[in-house]
Amino acid sequence: FGMKVIGYDPYMTQEKIGDLCELKATAKEVWEQADFVSVHLPVVPSTEHSIGREQFSWMKPTASFINCARGALIKENELVECLQDGTLFQAGLDVFEHEPIQESSRALFDLDNVIMTPHMAATTEQSVLNCCTSVANDIVAVCNGQEPQVKAQKPKF
């Protein structure tokens, strides 16, 4: 794509990530510089409803916001307001504050600058097959005294 990728992760170093992404010192720098802001966070007390008008106001006037992580990260009413008043150019969502979608999210359906899809893109035949194969291979590896290829890591929050 020829796209320059920038990001922020308080637990990652540029040395670890290599040239895949240019890490910024703060999340705000990413919001201010990116043409596409895509969030990838879990919902924990410190992140729940942590994204709203303030963050959207940092974005370029032509930037796009994408949330495929968790709906509860967003102050959905502020997202709607920013999309309506032009603070935010457009959004792509496949997660919502309340799922299944409730009447409180209805305003999103009336906006021309929002694309919404179901949160199930990873549930394809191939992805399920890959997941099952990976798990089976790692079970065999562990039973044979070897290290698994895919290891779960406890997140640090």
Functional labels for PLM-detected ranges:
Residues 7:
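Conserved SAM-binding motif I beta-strand of class I
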Residues 1-4:
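Conserved anion/nucleotide-ligand pocket segment
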Residues 62-64, 68-157:
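Rossmann-like dinucleotide-binding domain for NAD(H)/NADP(H)
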Residues 10-106:
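Rossmann-like adenosine-cofactor binding region
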